[in-house]
Amino acid sequence: MPTITSYFGFLLAALTITSVLFIGLSKIRLI
C-alpha cells in the first residue's frame, strides 16, 4: 500500500510541475 500511495503522490507532483512549466512557457510565448 505505501508504495502505491508514494507512487501516486510522485505522479501527482510530476503532473503538477509539468502543468506549471507548460503554463509558464505559454505565458512567456504570449508575451
Curated annotation (Swiss-Prot):
Q: Which UniProt keywords apply?
A: Chloroplast, Electron transport, Membrane, Photosynthesis, Plastid, Thylakoid, Transmembrane, Transmembrane helix, Transport
Location(s) in or outside the cell: Plastid, Chloroplast thylakoid membrane
Bilayer disposition of the protein: Single-pass membrane protein
Entries under Pfam families matching the protein: PetL
Q: Which InterPro entries does the record match to this protein?
A: Cyt_b6/f_cplx_su6
CC per GO annotation:
chloroplast thylakoid membrane; cytochrome b6f complex
Write out the transmembrane intervals.
4-24
BP GO annotations: photosynthesis
Organism superkingdom: Eukaryota
This entry's Gene Ontology molecular function terms read:
electron transporter, transferring electrons within cytochrome b6/f complex of photosystem II activity
Kindly state the subunit structure of this protein: The 4 large subunits of the cytochrome b6-f complex are cytochrome b6, subunit IV (17 kDa polypeptide, PetD), cytochrome f and the Rieske protein, while the 4 small subunits are PetG, PetL, PetM and PetN. The complex functions as a dimer.
Q: What does this protein do?
A: Component of the cytochrome b6-f complex, which mediates electron transfer between photosystem II (PSII) and photosystem I (PSI), cyclic electron flow around PSI, and state transitions. PetL is important for photoautotrophic growth as well as for electron transfer efficiency and stability of the cytochrome b6-f complex.
Instruction: Give the UniProt family note.
Output: Belongs to the PetL family.
Q: What is this protein called?
A: Cytochrome b6-f complex subunit 6
Source organism of this protein record: Olimarabidopsis pumila (Dwarf rocket)
